[in-house]
Amino acid sequence: MLQLTPLQLFKNLSDETRLGIVLLLREMGELCVCDLCMALDQSQPKISRHLAMLRESGILLDRKQGKWVHYRLSPHIPSWAAQIIEQAWLSQQDDVQVIARKLASVNCSGSSKAVCI
């Protein structure tokens, strides 16, 4: 894996959808694709495309569990990048937490949702 550069990080975070993904994962730890689709009100192909970009840059890690793919922030990102993500999260913390609370009651691993797309 290539080393994450500042230019790569800022290019990734300059998109509203990718920034939203990163901030939600910072708040919640790990989410599946369907949770991110619901939280950001975006289609699965669009979210998957953005997740692939974040994964390829080394910002995210994924793991498969049955038919679901779960994503989380990589613990291997440089400390300077983690600090930037943390500052972005702090500036949007209230908004992110509102979305996180809604997701907590309906995420795909919870019992209130029968099918995850």
Swiss-Prot record:
Highest taxon listed in the record's lineage: Bacteria
Alphabetized Pfam families for the sequence: HTH_5 (PF01022)
Keywords: Arsenical resistance, DNA-binding, Plasmid, Repressor, Transcription, Transcription regulation
Oligomeric and partner information: Binds DNA as a homodimer.
Any one GO molecular function term: DNA binding
Ranges of the DNA-binding region feature: 33-52
One biological process term in Gene Ontology: response to arsenic-containing substance
Cross-referenced PANTHER family: ARSENICAL RESISTANCE OPERON REPRESSOR, TRANSCRIPTIONAL REGULATOR, ARSR FAMILY
Domain HTH arsR-type as annotated: residue spans: 1-92
The species this protein was found in: Escherichia coli
NCBIfam families (alphabetical): HTH_metalloreg, PRK10141.1
The protein, known as: Arsenical resistance operon repressor
Known role: Transcriptional repressor for the ars operon. ArsR is a trans-acting regulatory protein which controls its own expression. The repressive effect of ArsR is alleviated by oxyions of +III oxidation state of arsenic, antimony, and bismuth, as well as arsenate (As(V)).
Gene3D superfamilies for the chain: Winged helix-like DNA-binding domain superfamily/Winged helix DNA-binding domain
